[in-house]
């Protein structure tokens, strides 16, 4: 007779609880950031766009401006402001180039790299041109 497995044991590839919590926090923060940008007159063109270089949280458009937006959620807005490292900036720039290759209809748009900072009990803080792609 075959031994049955314990139904309470975790699946072999189950995510750690802290990773699940971080994922949920990220999804919630991105939704808040998108709603905030929409209220400011942007249209969300893409969410969580994955490339070989990494993921772009939001791509937002307003008129002829295309903003690649990194969303950072932290306990305090000031902590979030320092969360986009130079290495992450380069990853986002590379991912934006991949997005533009996949969406050539936006090639003539003005490009910008923004951040939206999210913290509990605070309004989102939008940082237009949080960093640039120039070397």
From Swiss-Prot:
Write down the InterPro entries for this protein, in alphabetical order: Restrct_endonuc-II-like, tRNA_endonuc-like_dom_sf, UPF0102_YraN-like
One Pfam assignment = UPF0102
SUPFAM superfamilies from the UniProt entry? Restriction endonuclease-like (SSF52980)
- What highest taxon heads this organism's lineage? Bacteria
- Please give the Gene Ontology molecular function terms for this protein: nucleic acid binding
| NCBIfam families referenced in this protein's UniProt entry, alphabetically | PRK12497.1-3, PRK12497.1-5, YraN family protein
HAMAP family (UniProt xref): UPF0102
* The family this protein is said to belong to: Belongs to the UPF0102 family.
Please state what the protein is called. UPF0102 protein RPC_0320
């Amino acid at each position: 007779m075959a031994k049955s497995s314990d139904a309470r044991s975790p699946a072999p590839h189950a995510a750690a609880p802290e990773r699940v919590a971080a994922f949920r926090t990220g999804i919630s923060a991105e939704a808040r950031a998108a709603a905030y940008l929409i209220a400011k007159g942007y249209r969300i063109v893409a969410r969580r766009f994955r490339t070989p270089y990494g993921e772009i949280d939001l791509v937002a458009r307003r008129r002829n401006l295309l903003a690649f937006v990194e969303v950072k959620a932290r306990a305090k807005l000031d902590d979030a402001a320092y969360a986009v490292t130079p290495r992450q900036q380069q990853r986002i720039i590379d991912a934006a180039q991949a997005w533009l290759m996949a969406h050539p209809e936006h090639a003539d748009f003005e490009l910008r790299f923004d951040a939206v900072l999210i913290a509990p009990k605070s309004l989102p803080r939008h940082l237009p041109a949080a960093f640039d792609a120039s070397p």
